[in-house]
Amino acid sequence: MGWGISRLIGLKAAVLLSVAYYFHGLGATLISFPLIYASMIAMLVCIASHPAIDLPLLLGKASDGSFPLWSWIMFSPFLLFIHMFVLLRRFVKNEPLYTEIADGVFVGGWPSSVEHLPPCDPAVIDCTCELPKSPTLSNNAYLCIATWDTRAPQPSQIESAVRWAMRKRSQNKAIYVHCAYGKNYFHISILDDELCCFFLCIFS
């Protein structure tokens, strides 16, 4: 599976620390200190998202998709960075946000506005730990299985998501499964009218 997000954020930490060292050498302490803090947070995320550790609970995302105040304060350099990175990447790539891979089953990226949701009032399975639940989803059935980008959910999370999705499909609800960018792979099979979802996240 590779290092994925861990490698990216580790590189970011190194760059921030180098820039902080440069400004510190110029005597610009007020600039270097925030950069050092952002570098420390990035390194913490790098370690927590490494496959050997894989600790998405670090960021404190709740089951309702919200982040507590302490998380916004402590991890603001990372949370704001990833939020802006997702929006910028979406603007630059200009790719379809979601794809219907089976009847009533959609996979895609983080829906930041109502235009980014399939037009069928779907039940939503959120596979991100870095992005908050969008106000767009306030009226949608919602399940959060917090997962680092480019990482796979735990088997117990997959099993829970499968059962939840099967219940929603039995109620004739469409399902929207999303990660941050919509670039993860999702394998779907339908057996005896029961929806079985197997999530395989790969670095892309």
Segments predicted by a language model, with ranges:
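A phosphate-binding catalytic loop at a beta-strand-loop-alpha-helix junction
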Residues: 172-192
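Non-catalytic regulatory/accessory regions that flank a structured catalytic core
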Residues: 1-103
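Cysteine-based protein phosphatase catalytic domain of the PTP/DSP
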Residues: 60-61, 67, 71-177, 195-204
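Broad hydrophobic/π-residue packing in well-ordered secondary structure
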Residues: 12, 16, 41-47, 137-138, ...
